[in-house]
UniProtKB/Swiss-Prot annotation:
It comes from Zea mays. Its EC number is 3.6.1.66. Homodimer. This is Inosine triphosphate pyrophosphatase. It catalyses: ITP + H2O = IMP + diphosphate + H(+); dITP + H2O = dIMP + diphosphate + H(+); XTP + H2O = XMP + diphosphate + H(+). It is found in: Cytoplasm.
């Protein structure tokens, strides 16, 4: 529990250029976290997912000179010891849904987990706080509308539908992103951040 509410100089900037991701984040967070979105060209880093996310948050906080929220998503195949992991975006661009299935062709184990890491840096020089959400499932031949990344090939455990086949409200409830954002909401509720209003809207 925080002793006193921290005053943020401005609303949190959620760094993304992905319209579908922004739509999901808005739907899940609602008005619980005041944020604006901005596309920034952040360097593509290599390393463990949490390290990548924190580094991006540090860089973004310096660029916007204020609080930022960045997100990194991984799709980890257990048979491949966690790959493609944080590099899923490039794998998908290069080999598509069928290629992702082909990666597991030689393996009986089609299990995978989706992981989402949000990092919140309250300003330049501040140590980012991370929030991690995971959903276990398996990789299947693509089913459902091809609107959003690898949604058509990921079927969460306990469901007969892929992410792509689910109603958005169901997906947002059980997804890796939904779970991570639930922790973000919890953090904002307990930290009682307030945004400085020189110019209130």
């Amino acid at each position: 529990m925080s002793a006193a509410a921290r005053v943020l100089p401005k609303a949190v900037t959620f760094v993304t250029g992905n319209a579908k991701k922004l739509e999901e984040v808005r739907a899940i967070l609602g008005s619980s976290v005041p944020f604006q979105s901005l596309k920034l060209d952040l360097p593509e880093l290599q390393g463990e997912p949490e390290y990548i996310s924190k580094e991006k948050a540090r860089i973004a906080a310096s660029q916007v000179n204020g609080p930022v929220l960045v997100e990194d998503t991984c799709l980890c195949f257990n048979a491949l010891k966690g790959l493609p992991g944080p590099y899923i975006k490039w794998f998908l661009e290069k080999i598509g849904h069928e290629g992702l299935n082909n990666l597991l062709k030689a393996y009986e184990d089609k299990s995978a987990f989706a992981m989402c890491i949000f990092s919140l840096a309250l300003g330049p020089g501040e140590e980012p706080i991370t929030f991690v959400g995971k959903t276990a499932g398996k990789i299947v031949p693509a089913r459902g509308p091809n609107y959003f990344g690898w949604d058509p090939v990921f079927q969460p455990d306990g469901f007969e539908q892929t992410y792509a086949e689910m109603p958005k409200s169901v997906k947002n409830n059980i997804s890796h992103r939904g779970k991570a954002l639930a922790l973000v909401k919890e953090h904002f509720a307990s930290a009682s951040y307030t945004v400085q209003s020189n110019d209130s809207t």
